[in-house]
Amino acid sequence: MHKEMDMKILTCLVTMVWIFTVAEFAEGEQKGIMEAAGWKWDEKEMEYNSKSLFDYMDGAAELYLVYGFQRLTVRKFEKPSQPPITLELYEMDSSEDAYGLFSFDRQDEAAGIGQGSEFGGGLLRFWKGKYFASIYADGEGAEVESAVLAMGRATAELIQETGPEPKLVDLIPGKDFGLVDRSARYLKSHVLLNQRFFIAHQNILNLSRRTEAVLAQYSREKQKTNLLLIRYPGVKEARDAYQSFMGAYLPDAGGKDLVKTEDQKWTMARQRGEVVIVVFGAPTAADAETLLKATEERL
């Protein structure tokens, strides 16, 4: 009887310790970064939702909303005789959205922070799980840059969960076919697509939050070619989008999927099930065919 009571008491104590430990950790995570490399939080925190985000970044909020924006938390850090540092932490709808937001402007070298990162010009950008972070200073210098990186590492450590990259990104051909480093963009909007590669003012490919697209650049012998891979919710949606694209972008194709355009380069498009593949600006018809077939083989 005593042993049974002792076991119940022990179980209760272990449970209580576990509860308090989890609660303490969760509270610490909510507090976020307090200090990094001598820069201290000014104890002011700003939060924005999908409506108030426009107050913080008028004109740029649409980019974040397209990628399933949920919440933004902003903190500033100060150190005497040094420029302030701003930490922006965006909570997105999914890890795929966080990756997409990161990929849209990616251009600098990786910093080894989170699941994907870049650092250049004093700006650190990274993603981890469903979070995207942007950390920057209002000035330059080795000490400031070191602090920005330290703050990024500390922030990434607070984000406990990781998440998958979009599976569609793995379906594009790699460096064997000339894939340009850091050129793959994960897109959810024709407006964003046009900002990276203009196709048409109208949404002729029927892109939306229900579709996903990857735009990537390939280079061979200094010739640049763009590959666009789009997955639709179903075969009908893919077929409708393909027909819309061919009618608007390649009206003179005459039933063919390969056309020489006015710039003397080749564009090729094909639908395969729920996927549409388009190759833009290939130097030769054979190059367009090779890249498109390589993509088909990975589906």
Sequence positions of predicted segments:
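Soluble, non-membrane globular domain cores that form compact, hydrophobic packing
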Residues: 11-299
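Positively charged n-region of N-terminal signal peptides that target proteins for export
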Residues: 1-11
